[in-house]
From Swiss-Prot:
Homotetramer. One of its GO terms (cellular component) is mitochondrial matrix. It comes from Hevea brasiliensis (Para rubber tree). GO terms for molecular function: manganese ion binding; superoxide dismutase activity. Its cofactor is Mn(2+). This is Superoxide dismutase [Mn], mitochondrial. The lineage of its organism: Eukaryota, Viridiplantae, Streptophyta, Embryophyta, Tracheophyta. Keywords: Manganese, Metal-binding, Mitochondrion, Oxidoreductase, Transit peptide.
Amino acid sequence: MALRSLVTRKNLPSAFKAATGLGQLRGLQTFSLPDLPYDYGALEPAISGEIMQLHHQKHHQTYITNYNKALEQLNDAIEKGDSAAVVKLQSAIKFNGGGHVNHSIFWKNLAPVREGGGELPHGSLGWAIDADFGSLEKLIQLMNAEGAALQGSGWVWLALDKELKKLVVETTANQDPLVTKGPTLVPLLGIDVWEHAYYLQYKNVRPDYLKNIWKVMNWKYASEVYAKECPSS
C-alpha cells in the first residue's frame, strides 16, 4: 500500500495522473494514436503535409508506444513491490505521457483555413484576451517571443488559470505537460516548438514557423474549452 501511495499520490499531481492514465493502473489500459480531424496536407502552406504525416505517424506514435511500455513496466513493478523500478520509470512516464497529452491537444489546436483555421476569436475568449493582454496582436507577439526564446525543445501555451480567473502564457520544457506548471492551469492553445514540428519546412528559422502557424490556429476549439472551463465569463 505504501508503494502505491508513493507512485499515485506523492510523486505526480492528480491532474497529471488523470491526463496520463496513472490513476487507472489497476485496470491497465493502453493508449492509441488519435485520428486527425483533417488530412495531412490540409494545413498547407502554413505546415506541410510531409511534416504533419511524420509528426503524427512517427513522433506522436513513438511517444504512445513508449508510454504504453512504461505503464506496463510500472504496473509490473508495483505488483512486485519494486520501489527502485517505480522511481526509475517516472521520467519515462512523464516524458512519453506528456508527449501524448501535448500532441493530442496540439492536433485540435489546428484547423484548415476552409474550416475556420486562422479565424479570430470572438465572444468571451476574445474579451478575455483583450482584458488580460491588451489585444490579440499583443498576445500573439508574446507567445511568438516566448516560443522563439525557448532554449532547446518544448511548448508555449495559452492557458486559463482557473484559480486567478485569467489568461496566462506559459512555456514547458521538453514534453512536460502544462499541469506541471500548476494544477489550476487549463491549456487552451499549445504550440510545439520542437524542431520536428517545423524543421523540414522552416529549417532553423523558428520565428517564421511561429508567425505562420497562426494562419491555421483553431480559435473555435480554444473558445469552446474556455467557455466550458469559465462559464461565467
